[in-house]
Regions:
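Metal-dependent de-N-acetylase/amidase catalytic core
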Residues: 1-21, 103-273
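ATP-dependent adenylation/pyrophosphate-handling site
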Residues: 16-70
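A conserved beta-strand->alpha-helix junction
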Residues: 51-53, 82-97
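Feature marks short, surface-exposed loop/turn motifs that line or immediately flank catalytic pockets
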Residues: 54-57, 100, 169
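Alpha-helix N-cap and loop-to-helix initiation/capping positions
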Residues: 66-74, 104-108
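Short, surface-exposed alpha-helical segments at coil->helix boundaries
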Residues: 72-80, 141
Length: 273
């Protein structure tokens, strides 16, 4: 695990000041998940961690000939530049492959994450939600949950949040969905996301997609009222998974989906009568 402290801040002081930690699967996932949160806080109190090395990134254009080995170095450098520009308190690059995170090195990944949690003592952790379409994202969610559950209760964060990337969360019932004002984060996105040149110039316009999603979340949040926010992020409250170790994450997600099922059935039944 490589630990990068932006701005040359002394390591122990930087880690001691962390209040919110985001653990992501890939470089740029930190920003896609939590720019809305970051825009509303002191960035020096924020730390990001990237589980995989980015070797399998899609590529085209001027990046079409980049090898996997070169892409690993390139994506790490891009993430460091973004952390520096945003003013993060700390950035951890775990450097695993997707296969490591999914199966081969689960224990090692969870150990690294648990050590990072102990080093930073965050009040809140943000990661991928278990309904994400990307298998590596779901695997990182599982590794984060395993890492937290390996710690004694007094060493755990107070909150665990699941964020949007490869599936929007506007479908979540209100009981488990938190809406974050992401207007300031969307302003940050215009500056930070284009810095991931290997992605936005290599075939994936994450910068434009992120901004579009935030605006859509805000506008389509309520059909019978004016917009509360100009931009919004939807996040899933998963805290119950770290206060009740016996709760299976599948059962947790099925309960959320069942809430959605009941909500939509009630609306449809009412329209059919």
């Amino acid at each position: 695990m490589e630990l990068f402290i932006p701005r040359g801040t002394e390591k122990s002081a930087a880690l001691a000041g962390i209040k919110k930690l985001c653990v992501a699967a890939h470089e740029d996932d930190i920003e896609l998940m939590t720019l809305g949160v970051l825009g509303n806080m002191n960035p020096a109190e924020f730390a990001g961690a990237v589980a995989t090395n980015g070797a399998s990134s899609p590529r085209t254009g001027r990046f079409a000939g980049v090898t996997d080995e070169e892409m690993v170095l390139l994506r790490a450098e891009e993430q460091k530049k973004v952390a520096e520009a945003a003013g993060y308190g700390a950035l951890a690059l775990l450097g695993y492959t997707s296969a490591d995170v999914k199966t081969e090195s689960r224990a090692a990944v969870e150990k690294d994450i648990s050590e990072l949690i102990l080093a930073t003592s965050p009040d809140e952790i943000y990661t991928h939600n278990p309904a994400d379409r990307h298998p590596t994202h779901v695997a990182v969610f599982c590794r984060v949950l395993g890492a937290i559950r390996s710690l004694p209760p007094e060493k755990r964060p107070k909150k665990l949040w699941g964020c949007e990337v490869w599936r929007s969360l506007d479908w979540l019932p209100g009981a488990v969905r938190t809406v974050v004002d992401s207007e300031k984060g969307t302003e940050l996105a215009s500056t930070l996301l284009p810095m991931f040149e290997s992605q936005v110039e290599g075939g994936k316009r994450y910068d434009e997609a992120y901004i579009g999603r935030q605006r859509a979340n805000a506008t389509f949040a309520e059909s019978h009222s004016t917009d509360e926010f100009a931009c919004a992020s939807n996040i899933l409250d998963m805290t119950v998974l770290i206060t009740n170790d016996r709760l299976d994450p599948c059962d947790f997600l099925y309960d959320v989906i069942d809430m959605f099922r009941r909500e939509t059935k009630k609306t449809l039944d009412g329209a059919m009568k």
